[in-house]
Regions:
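Substrate-binding N-lobe of the ribokinase-like
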Residues: 43-117, 134, 328-331
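Conserved phosphate-binding/catalytic region of the ribokinase-like
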Residues: 1-7, 12-13, 19, 27-37, ...
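Conserved beta-alpha-beta core of the PfkB/ribokinase-like small-molecule kinase fold
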Residues: 155-232, 251-252
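A short, aliphatic-rich alpha-helical micro-motif
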Residues: 149-151, 207-208, 238
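Anion (oxyanion) recognition and catalysis
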Residues: 73, 99, 180-181, 238
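Short beta-strand scaffold segments in enzyme catalytic cores
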Residues: 117-121, 252-255
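Conserved phosphate-binding/catalytic loop of the ribokinase/pfkB sugar-kinase fold
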Residues: 106-110, 120-160, 165-166
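Hydrophobic beta-strand scaffold residues
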Residues: 79, 105, 186-187, 244
Length: 331
């Protein structure tokens, strides 16, 4: 039996989520519904502009893969996370918040610098817009990816955002190769249509000879496979992933388990905040399959979890909600 169910790699960010208006986004030149990488100066400008926006502010450790690992841990999976923080106040907050969720963080002592931050701006239509300053996360190295702990894991899971620069692409590629050589199953999320379109070469470099499991939404699937229909995208994904999951928002999700397709309808819910839905889905799905469930069961479970997170503000749900979702599925 392995020490960990899932070993995650990704950005280590402190997420600050806040409700804004469409007018605020337009006034400050923020592209709605997108994840935009910004420098420290731009983020400071937005922080100052947001000081007057005091409605529903939430702060938590974050980053896409981090959110998924926290979700999997909260359902009961054994988890480890590799990311890079600085020795500042935000870095301390990140580690404390992550550990509180039951996730083990790497043991490399942080250095001086600035911990990455993500401003998540949610408009009344529940759409989330992210402006991210990666900070220390950009300096992720092979050191944070503790090989002994990775080898002791069932699965490696990483976010596609890692491929947005060459240095972290190499870290991700090496981790993938190490995992394969040591019998660790590999999983990756395509993360964002922008990432898939602009950094397709880096993504292909990391995926290499193929992954055991790939997560994406329909737009990402169409973009990465250069397809016009979902059917064509499904055929294209079969050449790079042994299994995969395509989320389709309100329509639910489709998965390929290596031999056949499975699908699950969307769970009817009133969307309050879509931030974290995809991350929650991936975390819940990974928890399900590491617990021995099949892909159809995992789809239904992950759909229910994602619906629960979009029905409230913030990418996290209360501890009791994880128990309620499990009870819904008799576990």
């Amino acid at each position: 039996m392995k020490k960990y169910d899932i070993f995650g790699i990704g950005a280590a960010l402190v997420n600050t989520e806040i409700v804004v208006t469409d007018d605020f986004l337009a006034e400050h030149g923020v592209g709605k519904g997108l994840m935009t990488l910004v420098d420290e100066e731009r983020q400071d400008y937005l922080i100052k502009a947001l000081r007057e926006q005091t409605t529903h502010v939430k702060k938590a450790c974050g980053g896409s893969a981090c959110n998924s690992i926290v979700a999997a841990s909260s359902f009961g999976a054994g988890t480890f996370y590799a990311g890079k923080v600085a020795s500042d106040e935000d870095g301390g907050f990140f580690v404390k918040d992550l550990n509180a969720a039951g996730v083990t963080f790497h043991r490399i002592k942080p250095k001086q610098g600035i911990t990455g931050k993500c401003l998540v701006m949610v408009t009344p239509d529940a759409e989330r817009t992210m402006n991210t300053f990666l900070g220390a996360s950009l300096e992720l190295t092979h050191d944070e990816v503790e090989k002994q702990e990775l080898a002791a894991s069932q699965w490696l899971y990483m976010e596609g955002y890692l491929v947005t620069d060459d240095a972290r692409t190499h870290v991700a590629q090496e981790a993938m190769e190490f995992a394969r050589k040591n019998g660790v199953k590999t999983a990756i999320s395509l993360s964002d249509p922008f990432v898939v379109q602009v950094f397709a070469q880096n993504m292909s470099q990391v995926i290499g000879s193929g992954v055991d499991l790939l997560f994406c939404n329909q737009d990402e699937a169409l973009t990465y496979t250069n397809s016009n229909t979902l059917e064509d995208a499904i055929e294209g994904l079969k050449s790079i992933a042994k299994t995969f999951v395509i989320t389709q928002g309100e329509k639910g999700a489709t998965a390929f388990d290596g031999s056949q397709l499975a699908s699950a309808p969307g769970v009817s819910t009133e969307a309050v905040d879509t931030n974290g839905a995809g991350d929650m889905f991936a975390g819940a799905f990974l928890y399900a399959i590491t617990s021995g469930q099949n892909y159809q069961w995992a789809l239904d479970f992950a759909n229910a979890a994602a619906a629960r997170v979009v029905s409230q503000f913030g990418p996290r749900i209360a501890a009791i909600e994880y128990d309620r979702i499990k009870a819904q599925f008799n576990i």
